[in-house]
A protein has these predicted regions:
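Short strand-edge motifs at loop-to-beta-strand transitions and within beta-strands
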Residues: 45-51, 147-153, 253-257
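Extracellular recognition modules
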Residues: 63-69, 165-171
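Structural beta-strand segments of beta-rich domains
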Residues: 13-17, 116-120, 219-223
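Flexible, low-complexity linkers/stalks enriched in Thr/Pro that connect modular domains
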Residues: 82-99, 103, 182-200, 205
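Short, solvent-exposed loop/edge segments of extracellular or virion-exposed proteins
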Residues: 1-8, 96-111, 198-214
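Surface-exposed, short loops/turns at beta-strand junctions within beta-sandwich domains
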Residues: 53-61, 155-163
Length: 257
């Protein structure tokens, strides 16, 4: 066939049957996949039958038959098998991706920060000749185990904040494509945040009645700070010791220890 892989064909591909006779032929009737087909006379008793495959053709090994006579009208035996064992298989079924999910190695599996590994999992319905994966606009070569694939990518400080986008395009042996697959099957997603939080206000005081800048035994030290965004992990020390308590002011990014 004229497919990239000449032993396979898909809808829209042309299949050829080439044959050579010991003399000039007449009354040629070439059928390919059960349908009468066109043929070319290349001269010197060389011929080529050809046919454009479509969605109505049966899948599997493509059959053919060559009926003919010589110029005098004598009929020779039909030709329906190759002499060099070549064959063309026809596939009109589009491959399907399933079990598509995405996660990260962050403690929160639906979030990722700089240096975290984002993993994309998927399963193919049939063998492939090519698969292309993009994660956050970067080409990734997936690892394959049977029909299962995993593609991983380390997130960088140059990656844009927000939902991590991906794309999978898989072609089966005949070149049928899944198209551009960009959504998970289970609704999973990973949100990337590569912007470090900033403390834009830090205030340190005491409950001393005379001077909040002085503390004596029995006074409480207060450390107030405001973050540019909500924080998921805090480590605070006062005078080298862990504070009695740290809490967030409700509905704000203001914290107190």
């Amino acid at each position: 066939s004229n497919n990239m892989n000449t032993t396979w064909a898909k809808p829209g591909d042309t299949v050829f049957v080439k044959f050579v006779a010991n003399e000039e032929l007449d009354n040629l009737d070439v059928t390919i996949s059960g349908v009468s087909s066109e043929y070319l006379d290349d001269g010197a008793a060389n011929y080529r039958g050809y046919r454009l495959m479509n969605n109505n053709d049966n899948e599997g090994t493509i059959t053919f038959n060559i009926a003919y006579t010589d110029l005098g009208g004598a009929t020779g035996p039909d030709g329906n098998a190759t002499t060099d064992e070549t064959r063309v298989r026809y596939d009109r079924t589009l491959p399907i991706l399933s079990n598509i999910r995405i996660s990260s190695n962050n403690a929160m599996g639906d979030s990722a920060g700089i240096g975290d590994i984002d993993s994309l999992f998927f399963t193919a319905s049939e063998p492939q000749r090519n698969v292309e994966v993009l994660i956050s606009d970067s080409n990734v070569v997936p690892i394959q185990n049977g029909s299962d694939f995993i593609a991983t990518r380390e997130m960088l400080d140059s990656d844009p904040d927000g939902l991590i986008l991906f794309s999978i395009i898989l072609e089966d042996s005949a070149g049928n494509s899944t198209g551009d697959v960009t959504e998970t099957n289970d609704g999973s997603f990973v949100w990337f945040d590569g912007t470090p939080p900033l403390l834009d206000m830090v205030s340190f005081s005491s409950t001393n009645d005379n001077d909040s800048g002085v503390a004596i035994i029995g006074d409480t030290l207060l450390l107030d700070f405001n973050s540019s965004e909500l924080l998921s992990s805090l480590s605070v020390s006062i005078a080298g010791l862990e504070p009695d308590t740290t809490f967030e002011v409700p509905s704000r990014t203001l914290y107190r220890s």
